[in-house]
């Protein structure tokens, strides 16, 4: 049995940090030690920021984004084209698309993908909210921006089937060769998708 080398408060900090995606037990220990060493500059402000987030963060009732207001900043922005909705799996995907700055539209966060093997069905995702938004009218295009996984594609097909009779344009992101990518390094699935989604130049 391993000996304890620190108090329960620090052990708890390490255990909680280890639950953050991307941090295992070893990385969590390093992060905890760094925070403790920089107690005034990092640990205190981080604890305060986390408390504020716990008190103030809300899930947008319209799109599923996280913010401190409801509806969120994206939904409340009247400069956006609210007739186009980009459908994403997770909030991190919404943020990634916003960083790219390619579109100035509305979003809808599903909260995951359909996965029968994991017991995730349509009722477990924010699909009903999407159907309600589209059914209310004023939407001309839905851009399905889910990951190119089996679950992502199954989710895209399910949404397309559910909304096919509403007379809106439904598109999805192109899949294929990334900018700066070399063909020799791409897998067969990516190359096949790129060939099928080829465009005229």
UniProtKB/Swiss-Prot annotation:
Keyword terms: DNA damage, DNA recombination, DNA repair, Metal-binding, Zinc, Zinc-finger
Matching PROSITE patterns: RECR (PS01300), TOPRIM (PS50880)
Domain spans labelled Toprim: 83-178
SMART domains noted in UniProt: TOPRIM (SM00493)
Spans traversing the lipid bilayer: none
GO terms, biological process: DNA recombination; DNA repair
Entry-linked InterPro entries: DNA_Rcmb_RecR (IPR000093), Rcmb_RecR (IPR023627), Rcmb_RecR_Znf (IPR015967), TOPRIM_dom (IPR006171), TOPRIM_RecR (IPR034137)
Zinc finger (C4-type): 60-75
Gene Ontology terms for molecular function: DNA binding; zinc ion binding
HAMAP family reported for this sequence: RecR (MF_00017)
Family: Belongs to the RecR family.
PANTHER family: RECOMBINATION PROTEIN RECR
Physiological role: May play a role in DNA repair. It seems to be involved in an RecBC-independent recombinational process of DNA repair. It may act with RecF and RecO.
Protein name per the record: Recombination protein RecR
Organism encoding this protein: Agrobacterium fabrum (strain C58 / ATCC 33970) (Agrobacterium tumefaciens (strain C58))
